[in-house]
Amino acid sequence: MVRKRKLGASASCEAEDANCAENAIDRFSNLPDEVAHRILSFLSFKDLTRVGAVSKRCRQFHLSVPVVSFDYSSCKPRGVTNQKIVKLMSSLDRYLRYRGDHRMQVFSINWSCFGSEQASKFFRVITWIVNAVRCNVEVLDLRLACDFLALPSCVFLSKSLQSLSVHLTWMILEAPSVSFSSNLCYLKLEKVTIVDERFFK
């Protein structure tokens, strides 16, 4: 009798937990886009991806959030290997591909692990930047530990980009060779070596 009562109580608790979880998801899913985006803007890329797996509506929020922060230190895998680094980079590749042209206000990259095959990984980082510009990014924040950074010309030709911050580890930063007229209102260069004066013309 006691055992039956315990089983009944356990089943009741599980049912309540399931209902609570379902209601919590529904409440979040029913939020206005701007409210949900505001909440998600505080999440790391790893947590943002988890939210996107909860429901179809959450996936819509996840793919249209205007603030995207990809910080290697917050989502690096345990026992780092080159294979795991590539897998991590591929997750952002997929995200930006599925995101399409949803407008992006802020795109922040903090990437300090290039490991082997640096050229391939560097190309992927440049592709992320190009994708962010395609999404009409307004604020671009780059913190990279690479030997050399040549920013693509689309960064300086962008009509939406207003703020650009670049932090390197005393490595070379090169502006595109073509002339450009930028709409930048804010430029911050930290721990960089400038190849020439094109940045300031």
Predicted regions and their residues:
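Leucine-rich repeat
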Residues: 2, 18-201
